[in-house]
Amino acid sequence: VERDEAGRLIREIKPLEGIRKTIAERMTFSKHEYPQGTGQVLLNVDKVMQFRKELLEKKGIKVSFGDLYVKAAACAVEENMALNASRQKEKLIYYDDINLSVMATINGFLMEPVVEHADQKDIEEISAELKKTYENLRKGKLMKVKLEGGTFAVSNLGSALIDSQQPFISPPEGAIMGISRNRRVPVFDENDNVVPANMTSFALTIDHGLCDGTEVVNFFASLNKILQDPWKYMYHKRGQAEEA
């Protein structure tokens, strides 16, 4: 029987090593070296749910809400490229590639697989890529997964009983979007009638050494616009002409 200095009974002692040590070091560095600010917003996702249902019914394609929000993030970042950046020493680096680091807990560890050029992929491509990525991570095939090179991060806790979150940025990325669970709640419509709506809380944490609150406001405005018209944005690819 072993107790600590305060007399508490110790069940087990493990060394801080491997992936757990790497995560601890990265998050400690993030907290102490980057002045962070977080904004939160509650957005209506009824249209997203309808789009997901129609995609399954009409094309037989099942995508997760996480997939949809990753694509939405790519579109929102495309409209707010000041967030697609990194602060490294005395330099502010702005990227043209939009590579999304998607936080995921795999086999008990926090991983950050990267969806490269997410702005140039539609929802079907992103969903298929993430499914394959998660499968490789669960099987321990790390060499087949891109785990670095992200320019913007996404943390999805939508499947957990979490109403809101305040994610830490994951350097060198200068911003991270957090997604919490969907809740069906009563809201007022344009005629002041109480109606049910699916609402989801989104957060955006930024490096204040890189950008300011204005970018957070603009990002949420873009995100809301995208979520209200998923039929347009889920198949949007940067650099390609939109269909009439």
PLM regions with names:
Residues 1-244:
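C-terminal catalytic/motor cores of large multi-domain enzyme assemblies
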